[in-house]
């Protein structure tokens, strides 16, 4: 799953 937080993109699988 991918989400964007405060202009920071992180991908969690």
UniProtKB/Swiss-Prot annotation:
It is found in: Secreted. GO terms for cellular component: extracellular region. Plasma serum. The keyword Secreted applies. Keywords: Antibiotic, Antimicrobial, Secreted. Its main location: secreted. GO terms for biological process: defense response to bacterium. Antibacterial activity against Gram-negative bacteria. This is Salmocidin-2B.
């Amino acid at each position: 799953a991918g989400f964007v937080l405060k202009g920071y993109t992180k991908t969690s699988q």
